[in-house]
Amino acid sequence: MSQRSAGPELLRLIDLIAKLPGLGPRSARRVALHLLKRNDTLLKPLAEALAEAGAKIQKCATCGNFDTVQPCAVCQMPGRDDGIICVVEDVPDLWALERGGSFRGRYHVLGGALSAIDGIGPEDLGIASLVARVDAGGVREVILALNATVDGQTTAHYVADLLAGKGVDVTRLAHGVPVGGELDHLDDGTLAAALRSRRGV
């Protein structure tokens, strides 16, 4: 889009929208125009919601979740098992586990995964604060619920090595056949992981 066809305000809006995950310049233009066509019903309420979120939502100092209170609502929930910490890469992973409703322990969000390509090292993640939580005592088990990617597995091994010898069980989520999955539709890596994670019946 040329400078002549759009003013600096619109170009800035498009540029900012294009920084969102999964949106390129063309998609950003479509989103910007859609918002502008619905100025009163969408653009203004969205701008207000973004301003309010920026002012009120913060990262939980305990687990790394996002909320308007400190510590977050999940950390404040009574009846959860303080002795089990489930480590996830990012907040959507925490939300997914909460949505399932089967985990009743505590969480720790790393804020990503180790990545040599992206230049993300241990100091860029919440690994030190996880170790501090374990060192504070009372933790029996740390569950590594990290993504089954190369970076996720690298991070899992790194964290497991750091926690070795600290008197806690370090476990990871099972990998393999999803509920309702058919073997002939699975990739080779998933099948191999399922075979390695087999258990007695």
UniProtKB/Swiss-Prot annotation:
It holds the Pfam family RecR_C. The keyword Oxidoreductase does not apply. One of its GO terms (biological process) is DNA recombination. SUPFAM superfamilies: Recombination protein RecR (SSF111304). InterPro entries: DNA_Rcmb_RecR, Rcmb_RecR, Rcmb_RecR_Znf, TOPRIM_dom, TOPRIM_RecR. GO terms for molecular function: DNA binding; zinc ion binding. Signal peptide: none annotated. Residues 83-178 form the Toprim domain. A zinc finger (C4-type) spans 60-75. CDD domains: TOPRIM_recR. The keyword Ubl conjugation does not apply. It comes from the Bacteria. Belongs to the RecR family. PANTHER family: RECOMBINATION PROTEIN RECR. May play a role in DNA repair. It seems to be involved in an RecBC-independent recombinational process of DNA repair. It may act with RecF and RecO. This is Recombination protein RecR. It comes from Hyphomonas neptunium (strain ATCC 15444).
